[in-house]
Amino acid sequence: MGAEKCPDSVYAAFAEAAPGGVLCEGYGVTECSPVISVNRPESVLPGTIGQPLPSVRVAVVSAEGEPRRVAPGETGMLLVSGPNVFGGYLGVDADKQPFVAFEGTEWYRTGDLVSEAADGCLTFRGRLKRFVKVGGEMISLPQIESVLAAAFGGGSSEESGEQGPALAVESGEDGAIVLFTTLDITREEANAALRAARLSGLFAVARVQKLASIPVLGTGKTDYKALKASCA
């Protein structure tokens, strides 16, 4: 249960430790007490975060401009309403609270991108702040990381384990995509790997920065704030 996609390495480790067991991935945030959705043991769909809990309402809407519902299967911003949603941050002005009015209801704006199947099952697509708009298209930085980690080894920030990530992707203020890596990878090699993965030409690394190590937080996750600062 968490606010990030469960890494494939966790599924593999669970299958080895508990043969025949069922791993029920779910999703939640502190502001929603914290569970929003979860896979049921009798109907697990690996790679998804399941369906909303009873009494929890969700809406998947356009990430920019006035909210509008997106079609089933399309990626959009996740809104949540229900008795589990908190009342707001203490000491924060009302106009800075993470709520939005939509279809006559006040919703909590999660900042997360998901897609919703026709049966209501949700799939986590990433944090909005980990996307960059290029040529009018929302480009997933984690998707670029995943492709490059698979192509060059060393693991991404989610899969790296104790040795730390070998690469990470961030964008500068100008939207340029930067690959930070401890490996010897050229920009041409990185972009060739993205093309081989059949990603559109908008998924392109503008430059590569070699580092002795990728900065990480105390949680072991990549410190993207530090990387973004170095993009400036």
Spell out what each predicted region is.
Residues M1-L45, R57, P67:
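Gly/Ser/Thr-rich phosphate-binding loop
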